[in-house]
Amino acid sequence: MIINLQELIALLPFLILLLTVVIVILSISYNRNHFFIAFLTIISLIVSLCSLYFLIAIVPIDITSLFHITKRSILYISMIIISSIATCVFAYPWLLKYAFNKEEFYLLTLISTLGAIFLTISNHMASLFISVELMSLPIFGLIAYSNSQKYSLEASFKYLVLSGVSSSFLLLGISWIYAISGNLSLLCLNQIFSDLSNSEKMMVLFGIIMVLMSFFFKLSMVPFHLWTADIYQGTPASVLSFFSVSGKIAIFSILLYFFSYFSVFDNKVIFLILSLISFFSILFGNLMAIFQTNIKRFFGYSSISQIGYLLIILLVSKDEYFFSVQTGGIFLLNYLCTNIVYFGVINLFSNSCDYDIDSIHLYKGLFWVQPLLASIVTIVLLSLGGIPITLGFFGKFCIFSIIIKNHLWTIGASFLIGTILGLYGYLRLIVNMYLNPSEQSFINDIKKSNFWLCSPSGILIFISGIMLLILGIYPNPLINLINSVQ
């Protein structure tokens, strides 16, 4: 296999991260230095993000038959890297509490980031499976990094077992597809499917459904959602900002790429499965979030409904594909920014108070002590609810347009009911922050966070929150950016 110069340039962002992984391993082996490894990891992620600019002129390009890089995949890779940067920034002050094994956190984050990136550009079932495993395996360690807390160990063990079951479904589906079609290329699958007999089509369809079931588990969709709340509760907040975003962006991007060749509209079985899962995920996620008192569990159920909205984008005809990609980019950017803010805030206060601030009632009266931070959290919650002048409203408006254009009336009903239920849940959190503080709130312990905006975590939270407002009021730059990557 010979890789030419152009392909080498296309691999530059990934080679930078691979080189960083090697340096981090050597540094851990010979001379541990937490600050150096954290700084090196963040800088390498930023350099890798900037190097994506050089790919714009040479894409689309194939790197062997395993990977296919497009402008659209560059957009999703950018989001994944930004999520990784946020995770490393949030994790540094949190890891200072640990006497040992701080540096391995950044190694696991880099490896998982590489897996998510490779999944985004996968063009073959073999690279897809390896990328999913490369992305998932380090997450087991990240979830259990607070090994002194039983909830973290329990969450890691649950995710390990259930992820193994998910991987077995993925491998079964891939094997079934290959046994019938003799080809594992995502690009050729639709053509192969159309050339098969009806009985062979049913068997390939079974394999595709197995693959989708594995992805739905990773996306925590109903009915594969039962692990979500427990694992969100047990996972450290700094890890959640990565766990909740990068994998879901990568998996959604590969689903969007797959269905660009294998139209959902052309197969009633796939269309029905996606419709039902989207319908119940929206309703169940928003309904269960209302009854939560733990803020991590709340956002766990909220993520189920948010990805349920996102699945609607896949239920379009080929004529609407361009608009669905545009909508997906807007919605995922909103999802990225909101996750960075609210998990960043939880991490910020947990570090300041030396205990987990994960109960909703602990945030009562936050506005009267930290008005700017409470205002940013308010913007985030309103954006998740789809209130005007936020980016979330624009994303939901585009999804509602897809529902109308494609006559998805049943999904539309769940969309409206889910939005109302979601608004109730988000407004409950907002009102809680503006009430008078109670004795149970952590207001007395918050003094150390008075200068939160001067910290790297605070700057990241502030920028992400303000972006939701600016792009909600003036979304044209974002629309032009997404249109340019089509």
From Swiss-Prot:
Q: Pfam families, alphabetically? A: Proton_antipo_M
CC terms in the record's Gene Ontology section: plasma membrane
Instruction: Please provide, alphabetically and separated by semicolons, the GO molecular function terms listed in this UniProt record.
Output: NADH dehydrogenase (ubiquinone) activity; NADH:ubiquinone reductase (non-electrogenic) activity; quinone binding
Subcellular location(s): the record lists:
Cell membrane
| Biological process terms in GO annotation | ATP synthesis coupled electron transport
Swiss-Prot/TrEMBL keywords: Cell membrane, Membrane, NAD, Quinone, Translocase, Transmembrane, Transmembrane helix, Transport, Ubiquinone
**Which EC numbers characterise this protein's activity in its record?**
7.1.1.-
User: So what does this thing catalyse?
Assistant: a quinone + NADH + 5 H(+)(in) = a quinol + NAD(+) + 4 H(+)(out)
Residues that span the membrane, as ranges: 8-28, 36-56, 74-94, 104-124, 125-145, 160-180, 204-224, 239-259, 270-290, 298-318, 329-349, 374-394, 407-427, 459-479
Q: How does it sit in the membrane?
A: Multi-pass membrane protein
Q: Describe the function of this protein.
A: NDH-1 shuttles electrons from NADH, via FMN and iron-sulfur (Fe-S) centers, to quinones in the respiratory chain. The immediate electron acceptor for the enzyme in this species is believed to be ubiquinone. Couples the redox reaction to proton translocation (for every two electrons transferred, four hydrogen ions are translocated across the cytoplasmic membrane), and thus conserves the redox energy in a proton gradient.
Q: Which PANTHER family does this UniProt record tie to the protein?
A: NADH DEHYDROGENASE
The family line of this record is:
Belongs to the complex I subunit 2 family.
According to the record's subunit comment, the protein's assembly and interactions are: NDH-1 is composed of 13 different subunits. Subunits NuoA, H, J, K, L, M, N constitute the membrane sector of the complex.
The name this protein goes by in its record? NADH-quinone oxidoreductase subunit N
Taxonomic source organism? Buchnera aphidicola subsp. Schizaphis graminum (strain Sg)
